[in-house]
Amino acid sequence: MTTRIAVTGAAGRMGKALIEAVCQSEDAVLGAAIVAPDSSLVGADAGELAGVGKQGVAIVNDLSTVVADFDVLIDFTSPSATVANASVCKAHNKPMVVGTTGFSPAEKAAFEADASTVPTCVASNFSTGVNLCFKLLDIAARVMGNDADIEVYEAHHRHKVDAPSGTALRMGEVLANAVNRDLNEVAVYGREGQTGARDRNTIGFATVRGGDVVGDHTVSFMCEGERVEITHKASSRLSFARGAVRAATWLVEKEPKIYDMQDVLGLK
């Protein structure tokens, strides 16, 4: 079965990568491409915009006008746009793949209320390698976590607007859950001045922004006499995009609820 996929944020860096990944897939075709309401790109061919050649899919600025043209929506946009798109998908019973990060508590609640009524895969990162890292972090934290100082480092391009990255925060959640801690209570986001000695129970986060870094993440388990580091470095957004397309084809005919990439990859 070939899955028809709609891509929101089609004019952005990730949107173009998603269109490219859909066009490369043997299991999916591009059904629709959506841009912001005020975009000047309405009517342009989505494939030509993404640099993959004419696809016969005209860009639109209203998701509700193309609901008949796709089976699954892939959404990597902004929290407010994703909340609105989830409402449309709920109304038309359309599965969603969502990689948007930076939700406020209210936005997250509104999104999840609608997303849980249709098959939805939500992940901070859709690359196979990062999701394997999540599994490795869980194992490492269970073995070493109570004897190690844990630090999460992440770096991204200068245009990224949220920090720490959604992937870094998800890593923190995995680590905290593995050692039975509440991340909200133990997370330390940056340090400055006279901080005092480090609390062993804390999980530190360090953020770097600059250049065109696609995404680097390292978790360091620092013990007396040894240090274990688990690192993932992305060199292309296509690794994320291909994972999102894989999730989209997997979602078809699944039960309505919220899944994550660990479900897609069978890592649970």
Swiss-Prot record:
The keyword Amino-acid biosynthesis applies. One of its GO terms (cellular component) is cytosol. Belongs to the DapB family. Its EC number is 1.17.1.8. Pathway: Amino-acid biosynthesis; L-lysine biosynthesis via DAP pathway; (S)-tetrahydrodipicolinate from L-aspartate: step 4/4. The active site is at 156 (proton donor/acceptor), 160 (proton donor). InterPro entries: DapB_C (IPR022663), DapB_N (IPR000846), DapB_N_CS (IPR022664), DHDPR_bac (IPR023940), NAD(P)-bd_dom_sf (IPR036291). This is 4-hydroxy-tetrahydrodipicolinate reductase. It is found in: Cytoplasm. Catalyzes the conversion of 4-hydroxy-tetrahydrodipicolinate (HTPA) to tetrahydrodipicolinate. The lineage of its organism: Bacteria, Pseudomonadati, Pseudomonadota, Gammaproteobacteria, Cellvibrionales. Pfam families: DapB_C (PF05173), DapB_N (PF01113). NAD(+) binds at residues 9-14, 99-101, 123-126. Its main location: cytoplasm. Gene3D superfamilies: Dihydrodipicolinate Reductase, domain 2, NAD(P)-binding Rossmann-like Domain. (S)-2,3,4,5-tetrahydrodipicolinate binds at residues 157, 166-167. One of its GO terms (molecular function) is NADP binding. It catalyses: (S)-2,3,4,5-tetrahydrodipicolinate + NAD(+) + H2O = (2S,4S)-4-hydroxy-2,3,4,5-tetrahydrodipicolinate + NADH + H(+); (S)-2,3,4,5-tetrahydrodipicolinate + NADP(+) + H2O = (2S,4S)-4-hydroxy-2,3,4,5-tetrahydrodipicolinate + NADPH + H(+). The keyword Metal-binding does not apply. GO terms for biological process: diaminopimelate biosynthetic process; lysine biosynthetic process via diaminopimelate. Keywords: Amino-acid biosynthesis, Cytoplasm, Diaminopimelate biosynthesis, Lysine biosynthesis, NAD, NADP, Oxidoreductase.
